[in-house]
């Protein structure tokens, strides 16, 4: 007799029933141990005495399931799938088989059939593998930058974004900065700190965020370059955009590391806001780099000195745009109407373009050939436009701004239909109001009417 496969349950039953047969255990105790009734234990004992221990095994083992779909139905269904639905997913293919072909098969059964036939790959099998990119050889040759929106202060503070600058060759944290959201101004602030601390690298490596890249290929304004890209061009720094998040995997993995390590350090330090967090970040970077930074393949430092005065650097790290001056010496800027003060210089600027310099602290400078022009804000409206297109990375900041503006406005008053039609209540005439219920004339008329009613009856 060959080997017989048994489950753990069957082996336990044989062991307990053997003790009953040998007289070492009662039938009631065996039923309690096996979780069966005494009658079922008696049946199992009869089965052992008739067919041996092998008869304890479940009778359905080795037999096809009673609910098994026959091979003919399977072959017919797969023939239809190969012919018409080869590129369908199992869910959609099962729906179309039932709707168009009158063949009802569960989606999971069809999924297994299609997988066995090679028509469907599981999510794990479809996973694409990205070939790792070797590190750059020199320090300062390539710096990856990214922003990570997260609850960095957990429940102690509001969520914000962390701007991360990491050197590709060494894995060193070059610059960290807590900001409300990713924008050109916040990246200008982080870039200024980076340049003052390390100098100018060869290139930055980023994603396709609108801060770094103009999405429209045929953009007419700005020579197809963002404000951040224009500033880097003036500083002789290249900006490269990754085609996928996997391409800049080092900064993406660094974001996950910081979301673990940095959050716990902030909790231990009791830090609850961005200002205290930014003051703590230099100490965190120093400790992290000392522990995890690696030695590059080449010892060269490719950072270059800026050789720029602080005022000149601030003029580079700002938003610069051209604005057309109208006949009234006015132009539009950020939903504001700017009016130039009339003087000998501004009188000749009608029909010309002036240059606006917008700084991160809210200052606005209007220039003509490098000279500042006096102006005043004629009309100011900073409301977010209705149905404005907002990027996902700026959504939290914009919603906070909208909530602040809504709280400042008075609650809208809902007008009635009469008010919408122009009706105004005239009010009651002055004097004491007549009590018609106790008026003698009214009482006499009521009594006369009742008497007439009685006479008619």
UniProtKB/Swiss-Prot annotation:
Any Pfam family matching the protein: HTH_29
Alphabetical UniProt keywords: DNA recombination, DNA-binding, Plasmid, Transposable element, Transposition
Disordered, as annotated region: 406-440
Domain Integrase catalytic: 128-313
GO biological process, one term: DNA integration
Record-linked Gene3D superfamilies: Ribonuclease H-like superfamily/Ribonuclease H
Domain of life: Bacteria
InterPro entries in the cross-refs: Homeodomain-like_sf, Integrase_cat-core, ISNCY_transpos, RNaseH-like_sf, RNaseH_sf
GO molecular function, one term: DNA binding
Official protein name in the record: Putative transposase y4bF
Native source organism of the sequence: Sinorhizobium fredii (strain NBRC 101917 / NGR234)
């Amino acid at each position: 007799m060959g080997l017989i496969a048994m489950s753990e349950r069957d082996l336990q039953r044989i062991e307990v029933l053997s003790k009953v047969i040998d007289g070492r255990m009662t039938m009631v105790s065996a039923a309690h141990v096996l979780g069966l009734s005494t009658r079922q234990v008696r049946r199992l004992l009869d089965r052992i005495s008739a067919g041996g221990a092998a008869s304890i095994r479940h009778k359905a083992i080795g037999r096809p399931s009673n609910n098994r779909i026959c091979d003919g139905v399977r072959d017919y269904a797969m023939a239809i799938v190969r012919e018409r639905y080869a590129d369908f997913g199992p869910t959609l293919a099962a729906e179309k088989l039932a709707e168009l072909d009158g063949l009802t098969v569960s989606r999971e059964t069809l999924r297994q059939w299609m997988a066995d036939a090679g028509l469907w790959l599981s999510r794990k099998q479809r996973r694409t593998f990205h070939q790792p990119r070797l590190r750059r050889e020199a320090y300062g040759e390539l710096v990856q930058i990214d922003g990570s929106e997260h609850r960095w202060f957990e429940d102690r503070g509001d969520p914000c974004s962390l701007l991360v600058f990491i050197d590709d060759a060494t894995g060193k944290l070059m610059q960290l900065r807590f900001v409300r959201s990713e924008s050109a101004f916040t990246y200008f602030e982080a870039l200024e700190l980076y340049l003052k601390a390390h100098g100018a690298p060869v290139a930055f490596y980023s994603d396709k965020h609108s801060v770094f890249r103009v999405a429209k290929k045929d953009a007419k304004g700005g020579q197809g370059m963002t404000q951040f890209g224009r500033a880097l061009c003036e500083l002789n720094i290249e900006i490269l955009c990754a085609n996928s998040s996997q391409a800049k995997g080092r900064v993406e993995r660094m974001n996950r590391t910081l979301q673990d390590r940095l959050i716990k350090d902030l909790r231990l330090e009791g830090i609850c806001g961005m200002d205290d967090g930014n003051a703590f970040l230099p100490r965190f970077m120093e400790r992290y780099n000392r522990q995890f930074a690696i030695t590059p393949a080449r010892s060269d430092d490719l950072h270059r000195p800026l050789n720029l005065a602080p005022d000149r650097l601030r003029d580079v790290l700002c938003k610069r745009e051209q604005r057309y001056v109208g006949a009234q010496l006015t132009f539009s800027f950020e939903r504001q109407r700017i009016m130039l003060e009339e003087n000998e210089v501004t009188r000749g600027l009608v029909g010309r373009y002036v240059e606006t310099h917008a700084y991160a602290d809210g200052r606005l400078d209007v220039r003509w050939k490098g000279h500042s022009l006096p102006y005043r804000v004629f009309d100011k409206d900073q409301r977010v436009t209705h149905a404005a297109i907002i990027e996902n990375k700026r959504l939290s900041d914009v919603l906070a701004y909208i909530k602040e503006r809504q709280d400042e406005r008075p609650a809208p008053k809902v007008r009635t239909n009469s008010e919408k039609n122009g009706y105004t209540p005239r009010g009651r005439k002055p004097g004491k109001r007549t009590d018609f219920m106790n008026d003698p004339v009214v009482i006499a008329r009521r009594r006369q009417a009742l008497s007439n009613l009685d006479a008619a009856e």
